[in-house]
């Protein structure tokens, strides 16, 4: 049964699982019902639209007038060459925002991404195919590679490049896929809390974790506009929420301590159901429990110390009264 509260439960757990070099899972929980999708959906959108990447924005090919032209000695027409070119994923090495790169190939040759690697740029999908030229052909082209976010259509790029260049649709985002699942998770015997499982796949320009961090930063920056008028004390709000949940372990059942049957039965008979009840006790009170022997006493003391609540130390600080009240509510 869910209790009435005055603030939403703050998630306390996060896991990052690197599935492979370009795939990662970010798992966070527990969230109040409805909060998980409220956060996951915009984060997914921001992963696609705000993550910085690189893309070819224009190409100039010797002997070619426009994108519907053909080139003697090349298997592909110019349209197919451009499609293959846009499938290559570039990464500038020198933190530059824009580079013009010159290429020259003599046939016979099958050209793939690895052939475009040089001191300026790296192709992160080096096996991707570009073109084939025969023994009589020579392929020379200039390529503009830029740094950006999201998608920019060729019509907009055409406005600022030289007329001899062919403008390209620029797909900057390095995020190939971002999907999330919302799962239920149990908190304080309530199964209605939620877990976000976000899977991020990138093309290799950046790692999935870098992309995720960038989306979080973008969300913070976009939300900060409201603070210009409302003057929200974000640090105070976070501190308040963290204080309310920092001892959440104490609201778990003593069953989670994995005590021996003798020790657990002794606590059960004393109606001690929550870990927090042990944390609130003095060692002398624990010793006075009926039928609690020295072996069980030592076991409970060791387990409580292991989870950060040793007897004889004031680990709860000013949280004691709030914890007593919460446990009383749970047991009522």
From Swiss-Prot:
Catalytic activity field: RNA(n) + a ribonucleoside 5'-triphosphate = RNA(n+1) + diphosphate
Q: What is its EC number?
A: 2.7.7.6
Q: Which InterPro entries match?
A: DNA-dir_RNA_pol_insert, DNA-dir_RNA_pol_RpoA/D/Rpb3, DNA-dir_RpoA, RBP11-like, RNAP_asu_C, RNApol_insert_sf
Q: Where is this region: Alpha N-terminal domain (alpha-NTD)?
A: 1-230
Question: What are the start and end residues of every segment in region (Alpha C-terminal domain (alpha-CTD))?
Answer: 246-332
Q: Which UniProt keywords apply?
A: DNA-directed RNA polymerase, Nucleotidyltransferase, Transcription, Transferase
Enzyme class of the recorded protein, top EC level: transferase
Taxonomically, which superkingdom? Bacteria
State the HAMAP family in the record. Answer: RNApol_bact_RpoA
Anything noted about its domains? The N-terminal domain is essential for RNAP assembly and basal transcription, whereas the C-terminal domain is involved in interaction with transcriptional regulators and with upstream promoter elements.
**Molecular functions per Gene Ontology:** DNA binding; DNA-directed RNA polymerase activity; protein dimerization activity
According to UniProt, the name of this protein is DNA-directed RNA polymerase subunit alpha
**Which organism is the protein's source?**
Campylobacter fetus subsp. fetus (strain 82-40)
CDD domains per the record? RNAP_alpha_NTD (cd06928)
Describe its assembly.
Homodimer. The RNAP catalytic core consists of 2 alpha, 1 beta, 1 beta' and 1 omega subunit. When a sigma factor is associated with the core the holoenzyme is formed, which can initiate transcription.
Entry GO CC: cytoplasm; DNA-directed RNA polymerase complex
Family classification: Belongs to the RNA polymerase alpha chain family.
């Amino acid at each position: 049964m869910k209790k009435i509260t005055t603030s939403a439960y703050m998630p306390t757990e996060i896991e990052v699982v690197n599935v492979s070099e370009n795939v990662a899972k970010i798992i966070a929980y527990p969230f109040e019902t409805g909060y998980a999708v409220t956060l996951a959906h915009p984060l997914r959108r921001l992963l696609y639209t705000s993550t910085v990447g690189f893309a070819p924005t224009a190409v100039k090919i010797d002997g070619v007038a426009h994108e519907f032209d053909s080139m003697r000695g090349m298997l592909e027409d110019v349209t197919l060459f451009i499609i293959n070119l846009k499938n290559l994923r570039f990464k500038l090495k020198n933190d530059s925002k824009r580079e013009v790169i010159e290429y020259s190939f003599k046939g016979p040759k099958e050209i793939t991404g690895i052939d475009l690697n040089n001191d300026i740029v790296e192709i992160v999908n080096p096996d991707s195919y570009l073109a084939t030229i025969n023994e009589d052909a020579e392929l020379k082209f200039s390529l503009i590679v830029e740094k950006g976010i999201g998608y920019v259509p060729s019509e907009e790029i055409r406005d600022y490049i030289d007329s001899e260049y062919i403008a390209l649709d620029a797909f900057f985002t390095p995020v190939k896929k971002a999907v999330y699942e919302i799962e239920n998770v149990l908190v304080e015997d309530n199964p209605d809390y939620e877990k976000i499982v976000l899977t991020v796949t990138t093309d290799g320009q950046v790692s999935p974790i870098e992309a995720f961090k960038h989306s979080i930063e973008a969300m913070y920056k976009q939300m900060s506009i409201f603070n210009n008028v409302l003057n929200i004390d974000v640090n105070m709000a976070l501190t308040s929420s963290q204080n309310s949940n920092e001892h959440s372990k104490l609201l778990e059942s003593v069953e989670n301590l994995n005590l021996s049957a003798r020790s657990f039965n002794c606590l059960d008979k004393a109606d001690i159901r929550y870990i927090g009840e042990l944390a609130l006790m003095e060692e002398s009170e624990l010793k006075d429990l009926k039928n609690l022997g020295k072996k069980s006493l030592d076991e409970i003391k060791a387990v409580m110390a292991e989870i950060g609540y040793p007897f004889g130390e004031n680990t709860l600080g000013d949280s004691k009264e709030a914890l007593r009240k919460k446990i009383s509510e749970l047991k009522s």
